[in-house]
Amino acid sequence: EVAVDTETSSLDPHQTDLIGVSLSCKIGKACYIPIGHNSKKCISKDIVLKKLKPLLEDPSIKKIGQNIKFDFIVLFKHGINITSMDDTMLMSYVLDAGKNRHNMDSLSEIHLNHKPITFKDLVGTGKKEINFSSVEVEKAKDYAAEDADITFRLYKKFYKSLKDEKMINIYEVFEKPIIKILDFMEI
């Protein structure tokens, strides 16, 4: 199982450029692959996507995301059809429905007692706001890798809670199948 997160130039998955991909397959361990920053520290997008494709399309490896629908659409536009997906946002919704917000920063603070680096900390706001592609790779790495690690940690916690509270079938039977349906409806 691996947590996957894409960093992009826009919040619209249909109108965005892929800036980087972060991955985590162990709590406390994550990496960031920069591919679209305005920097010489980037790796070729074609090479990265070619290497990631077998991993992300392998049905025997679970891909975990926070609102993975966004990442699915972004990567699908680049020729990768992610299979075997779990979504921490949907898992949170099954566990707590209307109790809390289900964005990653809120979930991290509530369930992991950890305040993550905010997007605004990196890109600024208002007239001084920059595109993520202009963020220094070192700063982007800290932010993006943290996102993948938090997603992986939330997944482990939520999966256990769903099993303990006998709600895993609600997630597996009703919520999880919706991920792929919504993905293809939006493409």
Descriptions of predicted regions:
Residues E1-I110:
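Conserved RNase H-like, two-metal-ion catalytic cores of nucleic-acid enzymes
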Residues N113-H114:
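Glycine-rich, acidic and aromatic/proline-enriched surface loops and short helix-turn segments
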